């Protein structure tokens, strides 16, 4: 199945049903009084994380999702039926962003996590609500409010503990094949990897971590060169980044300049991503003598001004790979995950537009909201609508 990590959709919550103007008409009961019921609330739109999904391709074809409208109120004080909610299933790791405001309205990182993304409209009031000692035959009612409508950008970001970045042909796919059961394509030409892939590294029966492999970066990626930086977002949730450097590039390029290009493109994309813990990993050391490889690695480290530790590996024959993986495992044990925005979104949210406040104001000040054009004192069947401006 094709890997799609972005999609735009329209979500529309249901409108609230209108209130009803009705009077009780029954034999032997003169002046029965008002009995118009309230409308029903509009349906809400929810998103749910589903671990059985791994792509957003379905949302490239179905772009509009609408919840059901609440039914209007009826006579005999019958309340309208509430609109049915709809649920949109998305892969775990999906983030939903409101395109109009840029606000993140959902970030689903756990299977089964559910988040409301569009609130249904509130129901209107029937004329029964407006009866009083001085107004025994009210002809007022309120209309239901519109449901929320949003144009949303869905972004799928892989959930991994470790992210790999580097130039094309730095050996990222070879590394992930060496440490996990993942089998990404490996070949001797650039951009063999076209889509991100995940591999689970099992150190023993109780310890493991997930590695993400993304397509290589080249100079100008931030401006769209190569495959651009569209896949860097998959590294945002990682706790540590492995910067793989080909210690002896077959094309004769300078490893120092290659490393600087990656660092520069990383900073252009996101300061937050550039500040994540990053380890230098020199790959393909088997192509050089041991002493020559050490001298070359040390020269690169000094040229970059690198002050942290670095590793020398040969992913193709797993030289130095085991030690690197155990060091990663120990680092992850003491490095907690960043608190997801989903934690805050999952907390019980307070709706700004409160039902009680909305109707209390209308009931207390019906005369202030009258629309004179809708009222005819000479027409016994006239109905007065109350609008919230």
From Swiss-Prot:
Its EC number is 3.6.5.-. Mg(2+) binds at residues 173, 193. GTP binds at residues 166-173, 191-195, 213-216, 283-286, 314-316. Residues 364-383 have a biased composition (Acidic residues). GO terms for molecular function: GTP binding; GTPase activity; magnesium ion binding. Residues 1-159 form the Obg domain. The keyword Lipoprotein does not apply. GO terms for cellular component: cytoplasm. Gene3D superfamilies: GTP1/OBG domain (2.70.210.12), P-loop containing nucleotide triphosphate hydrolases (3.40.50.300). An essential GTPase which binds GTP, GDP and possibly (p)ppGpp with moderate affinity, with high nucleotide exchange rates and a fairly low GTP hydrolysis rate. Plays a role in control of the cell cycle, stress response, ribosome biogenesis and in those bacteria that undergo differentiation, in morphogenesis control. This is GTPase Obg.
């Amino acid at each position: 199945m094709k890997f799609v990590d972005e999609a735009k959709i329209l979500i529309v919550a249901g409108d609230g049903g209108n209130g009803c103007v009705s009077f009780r008409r029954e034999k032997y009961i003169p002046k029965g009084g008002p009995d118009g019921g309230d409308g029903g609330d509009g349906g809400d739109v929810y998103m749910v994380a589903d671990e059985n999904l791994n792509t957003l391709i379905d949302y490239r074809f179905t772009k509009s999702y609408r919840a059901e409208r609440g039914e209007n109120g009826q006579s005999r004080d019958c309340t309208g039926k509430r609109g049915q909610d709809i649920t949109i299933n998305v892969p775990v790791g999906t983030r939903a962003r409101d395109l109009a405001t840029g606000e993140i309205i959902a970030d689903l990182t756990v299977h089964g996590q559910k988040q409301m993304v569009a609130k249904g409209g509130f129901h209107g009031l029937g004329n029964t609500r407006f009866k009083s000692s001085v107004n025994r035959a009210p002809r007022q009612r309120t209309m239901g409010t519109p449901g929320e409508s949003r144009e949303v950008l869905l972004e799928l970001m892989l959930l991994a503990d470790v992210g790999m970045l580097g130039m094309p042909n730095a050996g990222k796919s070879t590394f992930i094949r060496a440490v996990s059961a993942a089998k990404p394509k490996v070949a001797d030409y650039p951009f063999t990897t076209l889509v991100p892939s995940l591999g689970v590294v099992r150190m023993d029966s109780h310890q493991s971590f997930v590695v993400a492999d993304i397509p290589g970066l080249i100079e100008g990626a931030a401006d769209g060169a190569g495959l651009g930086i569209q896949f860097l977002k998959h590294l945002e949730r990682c706790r540590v980044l492995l910067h793989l450097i080909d210690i002896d590039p077959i094309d004769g390029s300078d490893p120092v300049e290659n490393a600087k290009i990656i660092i520069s493109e990383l900073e252009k994309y996101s300061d937050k991503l550039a500040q994540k813990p990053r380890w230098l990993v020199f790959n393909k050391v088997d192509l050089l003598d041991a002493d020559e490889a050490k001298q070359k690695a040390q020269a690169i480290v000094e040229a970059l001004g690198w002050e942290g530790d670095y590793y020398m590996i040969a992913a193709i024959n797993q030289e130095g790979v085991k030690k690197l993986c155990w060091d990663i495992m120990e680092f992850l044990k003491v490095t907690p995950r960043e608190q997801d925005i989903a934690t805050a979104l999952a907390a019980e949210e307070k709706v700004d537009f409160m039902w009680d406040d909305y109707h209390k104001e209308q009931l207390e000040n019906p005369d202030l909201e009258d629309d004179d054009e809708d009222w005819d004192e000479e027409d016994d069947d006239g109905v007065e609508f109350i609008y919230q401006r």
